Swiss-Prot record:
Modified residues (N-acetylmethionine): 1
PTM text: Phosphorylation by PAK1 is required for normal function. Ubiquitinated in the presence of GAN which targets it for degradation by the proteasome.
Annotated PANTHER family: DYNACTIN 1-RELATED MICROTUBULE-BINDING, TUBULIN-FOLDING COFACTOR B
Chain positions found as N6-acetyllysine: 219
Alphabetical keyword list: Acetylation, Chaperone, Cytoplasm, Cytoskeleton, Developmental protein, Differentiation, Glycoprotein, Microtubule, Neurogenesis, Phosphoprotein, Ubl conjugation
Positions bearing Phosphoserine: 65, 110, 128
UniProt organism field: Homo sapiens (Human)
Function text: Binds to alpha-tubulin folding intermediates after their interaction with cytosolic chaperonin in the pathway leading from newly synthesized tubulin to properly folded heterodimer. Involved in regulation of tubulin heterodimer dissociation. May function as a negative regulator of axonal growth.
PTM sites of type Phosphotyrosine: 98
Name under which the protein is recorded: Tubulin-folding cofactor B
Family note: Belongs to the TBCB family.
Length: 244
């Protein structure tokens, strides 16, 4: 069975900020760490990276989550084309302060003085041991992420669409159903197995965030990781849900 390809290496998002009233559409690499991503946002929004708080909103402009793990990759969050990332500034600057460029003081600074400052991108990266100051750790993280993705792909490739299965997820009783989808999704990174349960024990109807992956009744569909799925001869069980 063939599994769909990997996600695009870049993503196009809208950037908004508590310091201005406009939005910018930008494309970024999913392999950026959140710390590196903040550094790229500095010139765009006018807030120091160390004073940023990031919030992720979906294409429907509903809040998803905070991007608060400095060493996490941007692609590890459910960031899709059309999403919005909002920058909350904690530096004390006022709304609109950086929109009027005539009010911005222009000056030069020596290399030594710049190195001594504690509020620069360089000092932030040095303190956090990120970016080019910790290339070894970043390379290791990327290698580990690639290894996990390869392992998931191998597991997913052994789960045919249409096969009967049993799902044993942590904290849940075993659930039986039929495999309806295998591959990558838009809502979260990695490989996922779409299952149509025999009874309404799921969370959806085969669609997530408006995108349909397979057809089933409401509450019969679920997406789980390949590691918790076992395919085989699993006939339907009587869960007793029709009893009064």
């Amino acid at each position: 069975m063939e599994v769909t390809g990997v996600s695009a290496p870049t993503v196009t998002v809208f950037i908004s900020s508590s310091l201005n009233t406009f939005r910018s559409e930008k494309r970024y690499s999913r392999s950026l760490t959140i710390a590196e991503f903040k550094c790229k946002l500095e010139l765009l929004v006018g807030s120091p990276a160390s004073c940023m708080e990031l919030e992720l909103y979906g294409v429907d402009d509903k809040f998803y989550s905070k991007l608060d793990q400095e060493d996490a990759l941007l692609g590890s969050y459910p960031v899709d084309d059309g999403c919005r990332i909002h920058v909350i500034d904690h530096s004390g600057a006022r709304l609109g302060e950086y929109e009027d460029v005539s009010r911005v003081e222009k000056y030069t600074i020596s290399q030594e003085a710049y190195d001594q400052r504690q509020d620069t991108v360089r000092s932030f990266l040095k303190r956090s041991k990120l970016g080019r100051y910790n290339e070894e750790e970043r390379a290791q993280q990327e290698a580990e992420a690639a290894q996990r993705l390869a392992e998931e792909k191998a597991q997913a490739s052994s789960i045919p669409v249409g096969s009967r299965c049993e799902v044993r997820a942590a904290g849940q009783s075993p659930r039986r159903g039929t495999v309806m989808y295998v591959g990558l999704t838009d809502f979260k990174p990695g490989y996922w197995i779409g299952v149509r349960y025999d009874e309404p024990l799921g969370k959806n109807d085969g669609s997530v965030n408006g995108k349909r992956y397979f057809e089933c009744q409401a509450k019969y569909g679920a997406f789980v990781k390949p590691a918790v799925v076992t395919v085989g001869d699993f006939p339907e069980e009587d869960y007793g849900l029709d009893e009064i």
